[in-house]
Swiss-Prot record:
<dbReference type="InterPro" id="IPR000608">
    <property type="entry name" value="UBQ-conjugat_E2_core"/>
</dbReference>
<feature type="region of interest" description="Disordered">
    <location>
        <begin position="1"/>
        <end position="45"/>
    </location>
</feature>
<keyword id="KW-0472">Membrane</keyword>
<feature type="compositionally biased region" description="Polar residues">
    <location>
        <begin position="1"/>
        <end position="11"/>
    </location>
</feature>
<dbReference type="GO" id="GO:0005886">
    <property type="term" value="C:plasma membrane"/>
</dbReference>
<feature type="compositionally biased region" description="Basic and acidic residues">
    <location>
        <begin position="14"/>
        <end position="23"/>
    </location>
</feature>
<keyword id="KW-0653">Protein transport</keyword>
<dbReference type="InterPro" id="IPR050113">
    <property type="entry name" value="Ub_conjugating_enzyme"/>
</dbReference>
<dbReference type="GO" id="GO:0015031">
    <property type="term" value="P:protein transport"/>
</dbReference>
<protein>
    <recommendedName>
        <fullName>AKT-interacting protein homolog A</fullName>
    </recommendedName>
</protein>
<keyword id="KW-1003">Cell membrane</keyword>
<keyword id="KW-0813">Transport</keyword>
<dbReference type="GO" id="GO:0007040">
    <property type="term" value="P:lysosome organization"/>
</dbReference>
<keyword id="KW-0053">Apoptosis</keyword>
<comment type="similarity">
    <text>Belongs to the ubiquitin-conjugating enzyme family. FTS subfamily.</text>
</comment>
<keyword id="KW-0963">Cytoplasm</keyword>
<feature type="region of interest" description="Disordered">
    <location>
        <begin position="256"/>
        <end position="293"/>
    </location>
</feature>
């Protein structure tokens, strides 16, 4: 039996005995409780430790979000799962991410740019999430091949994410916003406080030369598209050249599924129930026998 409940029941008995000796007034009798409404706690494991006596001070410490330290790993896993669910629901155009097999704190991704200065660019990246997420700093986003851009470090390939998220606020900022920001920088160029001063100066002073270097950067990134991932992981995003034997069948299945979905949605729209009789503008004017199935 849990020592915490033994201690509590003993203290209750002592208080009741003292109250009987001291009190001289009429006793108040509470109405009897029905046994059916009595709640019981689940069984306590044999090696369980009372919550009033932590094993060590470190276990009684709470994180900044008020979560007990022993729940930290579970809370982190739940937070990351919720974040990935939000990413899927947002359906960011041209952005695809996949959490790592080895660590949920590392996500692999790729951005497809369809128009603008960086048109036809395919940029692979990795997102690094702090181990104290969501209470730490903002996640980091590093491109596999440094892109020629004012906000991308020309050596490390890291994007200046802190520009958009100076202070990461839990329950307000989300990873999908970081991904959207990474996509937006290729369509809206910002040159203030750049990580790549050369790119910023060329964009301001010589746009044609800037465009030329961007084209070269896009070609460089695309030339490394089929390289093996820098981080060995079963869930890393890998591209391979088009193979008709493998890819034609998959392509046909995807197109067939898309066509089937479009036909179903179109059929539902045409044959849906209507409460207006053809040729009439009055609501609820459809004949009753037409509603029978």
């Amino acid at each position: 039996m849990n020592p915490f409940w033994n201690m509590s029941s003993a203290s209750v008995r002592k208080r009741s005995e003292n109250d009987e000796k001291i009190s001289t007034g009429d006793q108040k009798i509470s109405p009897p409780r029905s046994s059916s409404a009595k709640k019981q706690l689940p069984p306590i494991p044999k090696n369980a430790v009372p919550i009033t006596k932590p094993i060590s001070p470190s276990l009684s410490v709470q994180s900044t979000n008020g979560t007990h330290a022993s729940y930290g790993p579970f809370y982190l896993e739940y937070s990351l799962l919720a974040e990935f669910t939000l990413v899927v629901k947002q359906k960011l155009p041209g952005v695809y991410v996949q959490p790592s097999y080895r660590s949920a704190l590392m996500w692999f991704g790729v951005i497809f740019i369809r128009h603008g200065l960086y048109q036809d660019g395919v940029f692979k990246f990795t997102v690094y999430i702090p181990d104290n997420y969501p209470d730490g700093e903002c996640p980091r986003l590093v491109f596999d091949v440094p892109v020629f851009h004012p906000l991308v470090d020309p050596i490390s390939g890291e994007l200046d994410v802190k520009r958009a998220f100076t202070k990461w606020r839990r329950n307000h900022n989300h990873i999908w916003q970081v991904l959207m920001y990474a996509r937006r920088i290729f369509y809206k160029i910002d040159t203030t406080s750049p990580l790549n001063p050369e790119a910023a100066v060329l964009y301001e002073k010589d746009v044609q030369l800037f465009k030329s270097k961007v084209v070269d950067s896009v070609k460089l990134c695309n030339s490394h598209l089929f390289d093996q991932p820098k981080i060995e992981d079963p869930y890393a995003i890998i591209f391979s050249p088009w193979n008709p034997v493998l890819h034609d069948d998959a392509r046909e299945r995807m197109l067939a599924q898309k066509k089937k979905s479009e036909e179903q949605s179109k059929g539902l729209h045409v044959s849906g129930l209507s409460w207006v009789k053809p040729g009439s503008v009055l609501p609820f004017s459809k004949e009753e026998n037409s509603l029978q199935t």
